[in-house]
Amino acid sequence: MAQTLQMEIPNFGNSILECLNEQRLQGLYCDVSVVVKGHAFKAHRAVLAASSSYFRDLFNSSRSAVVELPAAVQPQSFQQILTFCYTGRLSMNMGDQFLLIYTAGFLQIQEIMEKGTEFFLKVSSPSCDSQGLHPEEAPSSEPQSPVAQTLGWPACSTPLPLVSRVKTEQELDSVQCTPMAKRLWDSSQKEAGGSGGNNGSRKMAKFSTPDLALNRMPQPLSMATATAAVAVVAVGGCVSGPSMSERTSPGTSSAYTSDSPSSYHNEEDEEEDAGEEGTDEQYRQICNMYTMYSMLNVGQTAEKVEALPEQVVLESRSRIRVRQDLASLPAELINQIGNRCHPKLYDEGDPSEKLELVTGTNVYITRAQLMNCHVSAGTRHKVLLRRLLASFFDRNTLANSCGTGIRSSTNDPRRKPLDSRVLHAVKYYCQNFAPNFKESEMNAIAADMCTNARRVVRKSWLPKTKPLHLVEGDNYSSFISDTCKIEPDMMSMEHSFETASHDGEAGPSAEVLQ
């Protein structure tokens, strides 16, 4: 019997995919063009069908050489996922992980949905916020191909006749990460420069609003700059990203410190850091990302979610000051927070008008409720998050929830997660209001609100007692009167005790006596 010889070449499949990726970058042997909002991405049908169930079903039903994706898909997100299909790696800015997850869910890429969700949870946890970008992990500044340099692959030695076309794919108006890249790159350069101690690493340059405006001018997006702001992620690999705990505000701090009687501060809440000033362009760019939420309910119409009725909010959060007479934000508040709120709040309108909190989420809140949230919060983004969550979730809902929109509580499986669409819409709205607002802080605040709600609900279970002389006409008082006689001096003692309890500080609260 003839012997069988076997030979194995390690990583041959990876080498083939690497060559296919280089061919894609050069536009060679590509048999399909995927159009995303006017941007054409050349690719190979076999690779897309092997990576995505969405493309596999699409190619089975259509042989067209041009495929156009729905408007909900963003070009930058598809570019990153297309790169993943060829390399198995994702490269993204911190904070864009939700957008990547929703894009992968729409394209039905199970690997990103399963492994990526677990990885992004680790990135968003407070324990991972302290992991910084070490000097030896700083991105290389060697010239590479426009897209391959984000993946860490060597540049192709063959000429790239379609480099200009690939570059145009990066010139996106909807996603601009140059300011963040510049800030994080300066941070890593300071750490690599051997700054003495923690003080040196924390003293990072602040960029004012004019600097951001200059960096946001339409220009080709340099991927060498963009890689400084992203953590190149191998699925299932280790975390390596810029330190989020050492980030500073890119704008000058502006605390809302009005001492007038109409001050919009709420002293009952903790002091919060001042937010950053933004522009309408920023809001429109971020709203472009929010359209991805419509893909949470693929194949069906997303259910419309509205805030709680005003009276319910007042019952659960009596400290919220309602000002129904306001048709637009006060000028004094606008001077402090700038253009970081919902665009329609700057124009006069009906207080009962329902506004979509974030474009594409189908999450609605009335103009009056949203305005009250901003008026109560002022410049404090954490208070704004609490106000918005209280507008959508009543106390009982918070008490029976675990504070996240991802999974049930590990301590008590009966506590279900909050509505993920509402939770993420509120989070992204607050991130637009304060770009330095970390998701780990938001999760901690939501969990804290659920804990406080459980405490309040638990206190409400305690029975409220009444003095015997206040309970008249009921069976219990008649039973007492039939079985025993209440002495006049004892009644006078109870009456004097009640008076002292209302006037003194050590007596029972008025709520218990009522």
UniProtKB/Swiss-Prot annotation:
For this chain's UniProt record, which GO biological process terms are given?
negative regulation of DNA-templated transcription; positive regulation of cell population proliferation
Q: Is Mitochondrion given among the entry's keywords?
A: no
Chain intervals for the UniProt region annotation (Disordered): 183-205, 242-279
Q: Which CDD domains match?
A: BTB_POZ_BTBD14B_NAC1
- Comp. bias regions, Acidic residues: 267-279
Gene Ontology molecular function: DNA binding
The cross-link Glycyl lysine isopeptide (Lys-Gly) (interchain with G-Cter in SUMO1): at which residues? K167
Instruction: Report the residue ranges that make up the BEN domain in this protein.
Output: 360-457
Give residues for the crosslink Glycyl lysine isopeptide (Lys-Gly) (interchain with G-Cter in SUMO2): K167, K182, K304, K438, K466, K485
Q: Where is this protein chiefly located?
A: nucleus
Q: Where is the BTB domain?
A: 30-94
User: What PANTHER family does the record tag this protein with?
Assistant: AGAP004733-PA, NUCLEUS ACCUMBENS-ASSOCIATED PROTEIN 1
Q: What does this protein do?
A: Functions as a transcriptional repressor. Seems to function as a transcriptional corepressor in neuronal cells through recruitment of HDAC3 and HDAC4. Contributes to tumor progression, and tumor cell proliferation and survival. This may be mediated at least in part through repressing transcriptional activity of GADD45GIP1. Required for recruiting the proteasome from the nucleus to the cytoplasm and dendritic spines. Involved in the acute behavioral and neurological responses to cocaine and amphetamines.
The record's note on quaternary structure and interaction partners says: Homooligomer; mediated by the BTB domain. Interacts with HDAC3 and HDAC4. Interacts (via BTB domain) with CUL3, PSMD7 and RCOR1.
Could you identify this protein by its name?
Nucleus accumbens-associated protein 1
Organism (species): Mus musculus (Mouse)
Question: Where is the organism placed in the taxonomic lineage, from the top?
Answer: Eukaryota, Metazoa, Chordata, Craniata, Vertebrata
